[in-house]
A protein has these predicted regions:
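Extracellular/periplasmic, surface-exposed regions of secreted and cell-surface proteins
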Residues: 1-26, 35-206
């Protein structure tokens, strides 16, 4: 959406949903089957919602070119796992409701990440470049007192092929650019709840 002249606002929302069910049966006649047969059912579900809000400004003043952006992003992810098993079936109708004994296990994990970011790029005559970026990320995978982290970078580049002293070799060297950058980045734990003390319990019915 064009707010004013070279100033634009964009909003993107993406939602992904996936679910899969896997049934495994060892009947009474298979090598791994119990006398009454065994049936397992595994159901996996993944939900992910991403939002991205960006305010961008792109403009040129003679040989000066500016590209700036401010953004806000969120990512919400939920994973659910359900496992059910039945055995000691009286006949060949292998449904969990017909099992002589059953067991079940369930697991659910959720994760959220929120980000504020900004960047600015400047170049003069498409020859000399300067770039700055900064972002702050908050992740639910980290303890509350360490949940937020800030990361930044600065870069510069020189397209030397456009310099006049290289005119004699431009028929051989078609492009050339030097770029340097420095910054700070980070990664988050792969475990959703590594910072917490977790307890596991189970109930078995016969």
């Amino acid at each position: 959406y064009n707010i004013w002249d070279k100033l634009n606002l964009s909003e993107k929302i993406a939602y992904d949903y996936a679910q899969g069910t896997n049934d495994v049966l060892w009947d009474r006649h298979s090598n791994n089957g119990a006398p009454g047969g065994v049936m397992q059912r595994i159901v996996n579900r993944n939900d992910q919602l991403n939002t991205q809000t960006q305010l961008s400004y792109i403009n040129s003043f003679g040989l000066h070119n500016i590209d700036a952006l401010l953004g806000f992003e969120t990512q919400d992810t939920e994973y659910a796992f359900n496992y059910m098993a039945g055995q000691d079936y009286p006949g060949d109708l292998y449904e969990l409701t017909n099992a002589g004994s059953t067991s079940a296990e369930t697991n659910r994990q959720s994760y959220r990440m929120t980000s504020f970011l900004g960047r600015a790029n400047y170049n003069y005559a498409d020859r000399y470049y300067l770039g700055l970026s900064y972002r702050t990320d908050g992740s639910s995978r980290l303890a509350r007192e360490n949940r937020w982290g800030s990361f930044w970078s600065v870069s510069g580049a020189w397209r030397f092929i456009d310099e006049s002293f290289l005119n004699p070799v431009k028929n051989v060297l078609t492009d050339g650019k030097l770029r340097v950058s420095y910054g700070v980045n980070g990664t988050q734990p792969s475990d959703y709840y590594a910072y917490m003390n977790l307890y596991k319990y189970g109930i078995i019915y016969n």
